[in-house]
């Protein structure tokens, strides 16, 4: 489609479970993207994990053709985005390729914190935001209250927001009709030199690197030689096309369009996300502003159960980082677990998803250590260092100041659950910044240690508010705190992979809770297993996993007591010898025991 005025690039912003993937299905159905036989629920959530958990993890793109009431046919390039707080970087990448966004809000639940955060990102990037009320067929739908919330909380006019039900299909045609008139057409010169932004890329074993691009200017077709600006390498284009949502090859991609380019790039990092593509004949084309590199918030060690899998594990991580640019990793070795990688994630859900993807897609068996955040330490020498692994902490005597990361958490919660949420925030060492009453909801802002937020705060917030509270958070600053390193000893030996950094006030409680939890998780051996928690040289908690014991006296009927004593002494000596040479198998659950201390 050569006329730019008939192209619309948009994405959907919505909180988890507000129905954006279902709305996407309706769009595809109405525009004839798939036949009735090929249609299935949540067509765009193609990863097994996405279907099982009912969430969108990766951004997906679809090109549809919609015949509007004015008789014109519009090309809609639609990019589906995730709604979970851990995947906000996927959202910002999708928004960079669009001119507008649909803000989909559940007409029963109202505005949630994550939609607010993503909506502000869209407005900052200069996008036209169009509100849509979904789930209007539900008995608890209250459109007037929700319109009021959109205006009060986000600050955009929602008086004429389109009402629809993605599930039943009611009002979806009206959404499409409003969309082509509200969202502006892209700008760009088709005859100018090629300038395309890479929004996403993934590795295909047969095709090499497949890049999803938004063409800003010019055009690209099969047989062109393209130049990747950051690497300076030239590649020959094998094919270009769009997703309808099937892989559909086209003659070319022009300014304003979103589609894929395959150029037999075999090097995994040959076309990084956020890079600019141009033709090799016009290397002077300027680079487009990419995306801000996202910094991991949570670090954890990942180790293969069998050391033979180490090379496969490294290859799998390389392929995954291409598809998920926020994942960072570096080699690490542990006395207890051997060789593995220290990986940086955006949050706990991100960590779980990555581990599951590695285990499923690459057939690996992995052990994960307890997650940790980044701490800042000031040493007596005057230098400042950052530590993301508790086992790498320097000796306490050389540290003058220990600083932990503080996040600003914004929580939206109905008034009746406010008390429970405030209690939870105080328990997590939160300091209240402000509170605003917005209709039936309350917006509270807290400064909280990131360590407390990333571990289990999200789950506990949901359970304490019966699922109604929603959370968004961002890093604010480092702040001095009274922190200590909690070591775990098994039979007198420190296990580096189990070390934690905790607040001194909570250390004794955490130590006791952790040793008790470990006692439940470590299987009984033929000898006693002592589990201790220590700060420095001081043991603050201890439990013992009792030995399994064979009854050696079973064959003695009556007889002399010295005979029984002899058998017991012999058993005791054997156990003692076994304890010296025996090693304790620690299951995966024990490494993550820290996450389940409160449950």
UniProtKB/Swiss-Prot annotation:
Known EC number: 3.6.5.n1
Catalysed reactions, semicolon-separated: GTP + H2O = GDP + phosphate + H(+)
tr-type G domain mapped to chain residues: 5-187
A biological process term (GO) from this entry: positive regulation of translation
Record-level GO cellular component terms: plasma membrane
Coiled coil stretches, renumbered: none
Subcellular location: Cell inner membrane
UniProt entry keywords in alphabetical sequence: Cell inner membrane, Cell membrane, GTP-binding, Hydrolase, Membrane, Nucleotide-binding, Protein biosynthesis
Record flagged with keyword Cell inner membrane: yes
Highest taxon of source: Bacteria
Binding locations of GTP: 17-22, 134-137
Keyword Membrane among UniProt keywords: yes
Function field: Required for accurate and efficient protein synthesis under certain stress conditions. May act as a fidelity factor of the translation reaction, by catalyzing a one-codon backward translocation of tRNAs on improperly translocated ribosomes. Back-translocation proceeds from a post-translocation (POST) complex to a pre-translocation (PRE) complex, thus giving elongation factor G a second chance to translocate the tRNAs correctly. Binds to ribosomes in a GTP-dependent manner.
Protein name per UniProt: Elongation factor 4
């Amino acid at each position: 489609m050569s006329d730019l005025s008939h192209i619309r690039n948009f994405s959907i912003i919505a909180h988890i479970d507000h129905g954006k993937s279902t709305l996407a299905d309706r769009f595809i159905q109405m525009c004839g993207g798939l036949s009735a036989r090929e249609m299935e629920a949540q067509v765009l959530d193609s990863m097994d994990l996405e279907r099982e958990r009912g969430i969108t993890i990766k951004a997906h793109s679809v090109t549809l053709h919609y015949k509007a009431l004015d008789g014109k046919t519009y090309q809609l390039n639609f990019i589906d985005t995730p709604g979970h707080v851990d995947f906000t970087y996927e959202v910002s990448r999708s928004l960079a390729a669009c001119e507008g966004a649909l803000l989909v809000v559940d007409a029963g639940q109202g505005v949630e914190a994550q939609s607010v955060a993503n909506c502000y990102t869209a407005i900052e990037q200069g996008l036209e935001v169009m509100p849509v009320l979904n789930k209007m067929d539900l008995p608890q739908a209250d459109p007037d209250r929700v319109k009021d919330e959109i205006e009060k909380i986000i600050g955009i006019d929602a008086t004429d927001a389109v009402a629809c039900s993605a599930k039943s299909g009611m009002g979806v045609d009206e959404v499409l009709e409003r969309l082509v008139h509200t969202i502006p057409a892209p700008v760009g010169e088709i005859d100018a030199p090629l300038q395309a932004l890479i929004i996403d890329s993934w590795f295909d074993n047969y095709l090499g690197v497949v890049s999803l691009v938004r063409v800003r200017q010019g055009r690209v077709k099969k047989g062109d030689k393209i130049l990747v600006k950051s690497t300076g390498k030239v590649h020959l284009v094998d094919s270009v096309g769009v997703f309808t949502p099937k892989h559909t090859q086209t003659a070319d991609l022009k300014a304003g369009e979103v589609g894929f380019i395959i150029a037999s790039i075999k090097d995994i990092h040959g076309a990084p996300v956020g890079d600019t593509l141009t033709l090799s004949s016009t290397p002077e084309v300027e680079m487009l502003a990419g995306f801000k590199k996202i910094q991991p918030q949570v670090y954890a060690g990942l180790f293969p159960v069998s050391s033979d899998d180490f090379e496969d594990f490294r290859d799998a991580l390389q392929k995954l980082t291409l598809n998920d640019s926020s994942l960072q990793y570096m080699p690490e070795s542990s006395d207890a677990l051997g060789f593995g990688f220290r990986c940086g994630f955006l949050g706990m859900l991100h960590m779980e998803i990555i581990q599951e993807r590695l285990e499923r897609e690459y057939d690996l068996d992995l052990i994960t250590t307890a997650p940790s955040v980044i701490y800042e330490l000031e040493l007596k020498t005057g230098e400042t260092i950052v530590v993301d692994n508790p086992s790498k902490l320097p000796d306490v005597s050389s540290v003058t100041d220990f600083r932990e990361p503080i996040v600003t958490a914004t929580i939206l919660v109905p008034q009746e659950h406010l008390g429970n949420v405030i209690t939870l925030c105080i328990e997590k060492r939160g300091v209240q910044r402000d509170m605003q009453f917005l209709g039936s909801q309350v917006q509270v802002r807290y400064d909280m240690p990131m360590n407390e937020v990333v571990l289990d705060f999200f789950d506990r917030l949901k359970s304490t508010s019966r699922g109604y509270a929603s959370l968004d958070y961002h890093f604010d600053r480092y702040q001095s705190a009274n922190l200590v390193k909690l070591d775990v000893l098994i039979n007198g030996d420190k296990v580096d992979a189990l070390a934690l950094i905790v607040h001194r006030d909570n250390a004794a409680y955490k130590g006791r809770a952790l040793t008790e939890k470990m006692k439940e998780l470590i299987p009984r051996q033929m000898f006693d297993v002592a589990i201790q928690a220590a700060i420095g040289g001081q043991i603050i908690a201890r439990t013992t996993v009792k030995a399994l014991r064979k009854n050696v006296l079973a064959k003695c009927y009556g007889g002399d007591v010295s005979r029984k004593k002899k058998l017991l002494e012999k058993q005791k000596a054997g156990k003692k010898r076994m304890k010296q040479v025996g090693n304790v198998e620690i299951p995966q659950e024990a490494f993550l025991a820290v996450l389940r201390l409160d449950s």
